[in-house]
């Protein structure tokens, strides 16, 4: 679907030079002299890189609708991750690149949203948080309470995260998957 520059909004998916970009930011500029234009910050969906681009008022942009499906993480198989569609139980391989950083924090059956373009998976949106049990934690040093004292622990899925020193093996912690940080200790 073709759009004029005034119709471009944050969150839209645009096809530019045969690549898909998510609109991160827009700024419409109407100078006193000359024609209007829009400054955009775009994120390449496949390569996860950002660019800034300016479009003139007369330009037309192609908007793309993605199909989004609710799926569950099943397992990793080499350089692919297998997800299962929760509606029809179809298993779909997706490149490990889309979840490589959060994979060590994903349990089986973790719900995700997979975006498809022309029936090809192009992105995975995990939940914001994971609740995981600590399987290995070294003891914190007594008296090391100045400031925010942290230590590295291993969780049940094999991932490592920095946590406050009071966290012990067997505790359950909430981890923010957006930046892989400790949020809080969870009572069972």
From Swiss-Prot:
Q: Example GO molecular function term?
A: translation elongation factor activity
Keyword tags: Cytoplasm, Elongation factor, Protein biosynthesis
Q: Which InterPro entries match?
A: Elong-fact-P_C (IPR015365), NA-bd_OB-fold (IPR012340), Rib_uL2_dom2 (IPR014722), Transl_elong_fac_P/YeiP (IPR020599), Transl_elong_KOW-like (IPR013185), Transl_elong_P/YeiP_cen (IPR001059), Transl_elong_P/YeiP_CS (IPR013852), Transl_elongation_fac_P (IPR011768)
Question: Which SUPFAM superfamilies did the record assign?
Answer: Nucleic acid-binding proteins, Translation proteins SH3-like domain
Please state where this protein is localized: Cytoplasm
Q: Which Pfam families match?
A: EFP, EFP_N, Elong-fact-P_C
Q: Determine if Ribosomal protein is one of this entry's keywords.
A: no
Where it mainly occurs, coarsely classed, is cytoplasm
CDD domains in the record, alphabetically? S1_EF-P_repeat_1 (cd04470), S1_EF-P_repeat_2 (cd05794)
Its cellular-component GO annotations read:
cytoplasm
GO BP terms, alphabetized:
peptide biosynthetic process
Give the pathway.
Protein biosynthesis; polypeptide chain elongation
Key word Cytoplasm present: yes
Q: Which PROSITE patterns match?
A: EFP
Sequence similarity = Belongs to the elongation factor P family.
Query: What is the role of the protein in this entry?
Result: Involved in peptide bond synthesis. Stimulates efficient translation and peptide-bond synthesis on native or reconstituted 70S ribosomes in vitro. Probably functions indirectly by altering the affinity of the ribosome for aminoacyl-tRNA, thus increasing their reactivity as acceptors for peptidyl transferase.
Q: What is this protein's name?
A: Elongation factor P
